[in-house]
Amino acid sequence: MSDLPPPDLGSEEISVSPTSSSSSFVPIDKNQLQDAVQVVSEAKEFNSLILDYVRKATPASEVNNNYHIVSVFGSQSTGKSTLLNRLFNTNFDVMDESNRSQTTKGIWMAYSSIITTSQGPVPSKGGENIFVMDVEGTDGRERGEDQDFERKAALFALSTSEVLIINVWEHQIGLYQGANMGLLKTVFEVNLSLFGRTKLEMNEHKVLLLFVIRDHIGTTSKESLAATVTQDLIKMWDSLSKPQELAHLQFSDFFDIQFHTLRHKILQPGEFTTDVQLLGDRFTDHKNEDFLFKKYYHHDIPIDGWTMYAENCWDQIDKNKDLDLPTQQILVAKFKCDEILTSVFEEFRSKFEERHAKYAPTDIKEEVDYEELGGSLGDLKEDTLENYDMMASRYNQSVYLQKRKTLEQKITDVYQDLVDQHGAHMVSKLSAKFASSLSSKKLPKDVSFALATEALRKDIVHQFLKNCSCITLNGSLDHAKHVTSFTRKLDSILSKQRFVELNSILAKSLKKVESAVAKAITQEISEPSESTWDRVLEKFKGAQDEYFYSKYETATGVDFGLGTSASVNERALEKFQFRAWSLLHLQMRKLISKDNLVIILKDRFEDKFRYDENGIPRLYQNSHELELNFTAAKEHALKALPILTLATLSDGTTIVPKYDVRDKRLQKKLGAAFDTTGEVDLKDEDVESDTDEEDEDENEPKCFAEAISETDKASVLSKFKKETDATFVESKRALIQHVTHIPYYIYIVILVLGWNEFMAVLRNPFFFTLLLMLGAGTYVLYHLNLLKPAMVVVQRMFDECLVIAKQKLKEFIDEQPQEHAKRLSKMAGITEDKPEEIEMSDLTPPGEGS
């Protein structure tokens, strides 16, 4: 192939090849004729520069699929080249009539710029771009019995052309060799092997066999000649050996047959020209009922792909390999579509990186407009596919569509990375927004938590799906995993918040119940009675009804309005009940502790011992009265002890809680708040070590109703006895001091001896006023029944002053002997011995420091 001269349409020099007819390119009149290029040399070498010829003859981008390939086939020296030159205004070499020999060697092709018609020359450009191939004639003496090239050339023409002109003389009709029937049979057999299986797939492609009958005299009509040829062809087709699966295929499934007659060129030149013009009409006039170009004749390959397709076909034919023409067309389409795909995808990547690098989620600080981003992605994808469609839709449709899907997938892969980044970013951002919005302070107060969160979740999911729809081009990109991840995260956040709210509801309700229970117990223990614990239990249940059951109890159970499951609600109810009973038990233990119980008993004792039924302080006049009241007060105080230490109802039964609040397993299971995932019940073996009987405190109460243990009760009794006994002794001492009084006659003596002083007081206005005030105060105290308490207070003050005076006198008396001894020592000149002081000399040599 290297010795083939390159096409040069701009030069008028003749390039001579020793193996060609005269030259590979023929100089012509450029106003009407076109140069011809040798496609396959007589040495079976394919010219790989055909595309350059096509591009120079007419731009390939303008031709696109708007072209037709016409080949001529027939015996040598039958005027094939002459016919093409006259009809298509080409300039193929023609035979020198003075020397009948082979003119066309190999296969040549030329672009037909003008077609001869009855309306005159019709330009090919802008209409039907026709490329004409002149095939070397058959049955030539130059090749003799070597029919290899003839067969290969016929196969090549059949494989690459839409219309195959079979040039035959009228007198050859009915002959076998003269009409090239033997060669046609070979062509049919190969055609069956090439296209047979594609016909099973409903392939509509056909080849038009246009028989041009030369030197038609008119004695035998064209219809009669056509019938003869058609019968011979069908008979020959039926005689072919076909595979079983192709036996049903008919001649008409592969070929269409048309006929045209030409009168003698020399003897009837005018009629010959007219017949050529009429044949030209059939190539150009779409309205002509005998128009030759049909859509299903075309190979559906753009002109730039056809040149590659033709080269591949010849390579397979020349190497005597099985020629699968559809496969060759597909290979060409694949190569070209891959080339186009690579080009448009590189352009796409460049634009994508330029436009959308700013949308990388790691660099995003401001809010992303996903609608704008999605629109930009969609426009870029659409532009890329349009560019591909414009260039690749000219090729085999199945390959074009397959490669289009490949391009779409490559674009999808690029977009998918961006979608995954934004999807993860949206999951993180919107879930954080959802978690923040779940705060009870931000939710509406007029609806339940479940309804509010459902609406909030719906809005967040709608926003997420809307953003996903924008950037996934209405769902064409995969975002299911992000939707799943997002919904799971929302469910997790919502589940955690539900338990937070549930814990809050339980805590608030229990706090109010605890406050009510503490208040009830505090009120009842001050004045305990047989029905004390009935009232405490009633207030305990009433507080539960008021703060819990009235709000959350329904006909089917409890509902907190949080959207929690029935099982969770049931466990919450169990927790509330257990913790409520635990709080009751805790308040009992707290308010009726050892110290508090001693105080309660002492207060009851003091109230009975020191005050009468009217609340007036008692002033005991004798020991008998004191002892009786002491015993009564003590019994009164101790009546409360069994009531307070054991929660017993008026019917004699003790309070039994619904749950054993002292059970450590239940304390772990029901005593704690819900965790964020919903508490999992503990198994008995999980707390086995915590329920070991050896670890139980002996001082602990044995049951729920016991406020304190028996040991603590004994301690309370002992302490109470000591304190009450101390009170009794104190009162007894005061009574004795009060009973030991001054004799009455002393007052008479004082009155007689101090009469003058009394009169002096009465005559003195100041003293008289003071006396009136004291008298008025005494009168008021008497009428208020406070005289005795006042006297007791005065007596105690006097006693206290007396004690202090005695103490001071004692201190003074103790100091007198010591002071007297010191004065005597001074008068005698006795001094205390003092230690003798001796001064030490400094023995350190002069000039030396310490």
From Swiss-Prot:
Lumenal compartment residues: 763-765
Domain GB1/RHD3-type G per the UniProt entry, residue ranges: 64-297
Membrane topology (Cytoplasmic): 1-741, 787-850
Main location (coarse class): endoplasmic reticulum
Region of interest called Disordered, as start-end residue ranges on this chain: 1-27, 816-850
Domain of life: Eukaryota
Compositional bias annotation for Low complexity: 12-27
Protein name per Swiss-Prot or TrEMBL: Protein SEY1
Species: Meyerozyma guilliermondii (strain ATCC 6260 / CBS 566 / DSM 6381 / JCM 1539 / NBRC 10279 / NRRL Y-324)
